[in-house]
Amino acid sequence: YTPEQKATYPIYNQHPYVGNLTLGLTSLVKNEDRANSLELQLGTTGTNSLAKGSQHFIHKLWGMEQWPGWANQLPGEITANLFFKRYYRLRGLEKRYGSGFETDALAYWHADAGTVKVQAGGGMSFRFGYNLGNTSPENSIRGATSAAPPFVYNRMSVSNWGYYGYIHAAVRAVAHDLYLDGTVFRSSPKYVNKYPVVGEWGYGFGLRYKRSELLFGLHYMTKEYTQQESMQCVGVLQLRHTF
């Protein structure tokens, strides 16, 4: 993350420079209608996160301007976070039409706790398309479980190929956000005042061949802190393969 303006000195009332390099381990227990996901993420902020070098590489690759203020990034700190998510299959929205066209949906709630995020919320995703097969409408931009179907599906495929569109909406209440509030165990400046509630919605498209999927989407988030000029738009690009 970087502020909106480029400068070599700290810019208050804007997002601080911060990166977090993480490694996650996820347990997913599921049946045909419910699923529980528990993920542990360990990581580090500061120079060990490699955020500066990663951003400079991507900006150079695409011919974009560099941001010079990484000397002011939040200090290095070991991070640890637990993410719990409970999924519900919405069978009432599962419909099968002629020629292989289908709809499906899921809802979920989640609770996260640790040094990076302390928050809770819920959301819903809805899909419509051709030959959905044994894939799912899960399309989160956070966590590792978005790559795995959260339910045990037994749907028949009418072709090796499939395609779909999706829409998604979610809301969460945020008590702590390291990226806005600063590090927990090391002193860091307070740059912004965050909002306690954040909304998110998005849409996208997916293409499936047998057990592999390519997904692209755009997700929009309401302002996360009071001085933020506009909402965020995050692009999602995922390549999935189910074994």
What kind of feature is each model-predicted range?
Residues K30-S37, L90-A105, N131-R142, V152-G162:
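Short loop/turn motifs that connect adjacent beta-strands in outer-membrane beta-barrel proteins
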Residues Y1, L40-G46, R86, A107-T115, ...:
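Transmembrane beta-barrel strands of outer-membrane/channel proteins
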Residues Y17-L21, N36, G76-L82, T103-A105, ...:
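Residues that define the transmembrane beta-barrel architecture of outer-membrane proteins
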Residues T26-L28, K85-R89, S125-G129, G202-R208, ...:
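Transmembrane beta-barrel domains of outer membrane proteins
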Residues N36-L42, L82, R96-S99, T103-A111, ...:
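Transmembrane beta-strands of outer-membrane beta-barrel proteins
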Residues Y1-S54:
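Long, hydrophobic/aromatic-enriched structural stretches that serve as scaffold segments
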Residues Y9-Y12, Q66-N72, H110, S187-Y191, ...:
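Extracellular loop and loop/strand-boundary signature of outer-membrane beta-barrel proteins
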Residues E4-Q5, N131-F243:
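Outer membrane beta-barrel transmembrane domains
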